[in-house]
A protein has these predicted regions:
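Conserved, structured core segments of small domains
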Residues: 1-106
Length: 106
């Protein structure tokens, strides 16, 4: 089962402790061969929202929130439980939230 894993960070919390352990998480997912892709994303100040077939385009932050999507990973796991276990070990889970969404596959 493939899952899109959103890494949501809270800018009000310090994240320096997580920097060292991300490499450990990446090594573990490589060892288990479950991570297919992943990248950090730029912050909400660089975001663009497009609606109504391109007629409405908005740049910049959109919501008065301190939590935003800071990155994503694509996981390919045997079960949902395995995906949850792997996501729960991501170091940024301590500084925000990890959201898992299964791919729509038949």
């Amino acid at each position: 089962m493939r899952f899109l894993m959103f890494v949501c960070v809270d800018e009000t919390l310090g994240m320096t402790e997580a920097d060292d352990t991300v490499e450990q998480w990446l090594a573990e997912t490589a060892r288990r061969d479950v991570r297919r892709e992943g990248h950090q994303l730029r912050g909400p100040d660089d975001a663009t929202t497009v609606r109504d077939h391109g007629a409405l385009i908005t740049d910049g932050p959109f919501a008065d929130t301190k939590e935003w999507i800071g990155g994503y990973d694509i996981l390919d796991c045997a079960t949902r439980e395995e995906a949850i276990e792997i996501a729960s070990k991501h170091p940024l889970a301590r500084f925000g939230a990890i959201e898992l969404r299964p791919f729509w596959e038949e």
